[in-house]
């Protein structure tokens, strides 16, 4: 009887997991900003091929912006749930708009045979794309915020940042001790990234 119960429980779990829509679960987050580039990071609930489309904010170009992929030795990385796409070739002190996309990898039986599924974008419910400004040329100033010693207390982080106008900051740095210990990737989002 116990075996039968475990079989039904496993089947119910598998059906529930399969029924979940493919989606972006966290992000996007901007990392490693410079005068001429930025890395855009996000996660999905299933493996995917992901890309960023970025263009100057004042651009009126009717053509779609170029796609930037996460690559190694020129090969696009797919089959991952953590996506970190470097956008290169940007101009210093310039406003950009960007969108992120992930296309589900449904199966990948061998290196030359990938079946892709649904494509999702994090800004589908937004009227406009996300935005950022690259760091200014050398000698220009910028404002930033340094946070540390939160130790997984997201409520403390939320209270500390309540009056911060993030639109006035060039960047936010997490200096250390943001979690007391890390047991899973999901904990990082719960402890401070999604706060």
Predicted regions and their residues:
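Hydrophobic h-region of N-terminal signal peptides that target proteins for export
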Residues: 9-18
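Acidic, histidine-bearing metal-coordination/catalytic regions of metal-dependent phosphoesterases
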Residues: 18-146, 166-167
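Alpha-helix initiation/capping motif
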Residues: 8, 56-57, 127, 153, ...
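Active-site neighborhood of divalent metal-dependent phosphoester/pyrophosphate hydrolases
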Residues: 109-110, 139-195
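Positively charged n-region of N-terminal signal peptides that target proteins for export
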Residues: 1-4
């Amino acid at each position: 009887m116990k075996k039968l119960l475990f079989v039904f429980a496993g089947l119910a779990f598998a059906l529930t997991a399969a029924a979940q829509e493919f989606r972006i679960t966290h992000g996007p987050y901007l990392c490693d900003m410079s005068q001429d580039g930025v890395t855009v990071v996000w996660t999905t609930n299933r493996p995917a091929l992901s890309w960023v489309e970025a263009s100057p904010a004042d651009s009126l170009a009717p053509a779609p912006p170029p796609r930037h992929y996460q690559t190694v030795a020129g090969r696009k990385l797919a089959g991952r749930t953590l996506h970190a796409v470097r956008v290169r070739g940007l101009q210093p002190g310039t406003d950009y708009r960007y969108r992120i996309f992930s296309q589900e990898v449904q199966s990948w039986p061998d290196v030359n045979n990938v079946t892709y599924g649904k494509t999702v974008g994090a800004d589908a419910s937004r009227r406009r794309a996300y935005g950022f400004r690259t760091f200014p040329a050398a000698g220009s100033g910028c404002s930033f915020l340094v946070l540390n010693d939160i130790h997984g207390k997201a409520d403390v982080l939320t209270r500390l940042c309540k009056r911060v106008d993030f639109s006035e900051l060039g960047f936010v740095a997490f200096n250390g001790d943001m979690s007391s210990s890390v047991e899973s990737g999901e904990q990082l989002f719960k402890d401070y990234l999604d706060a």
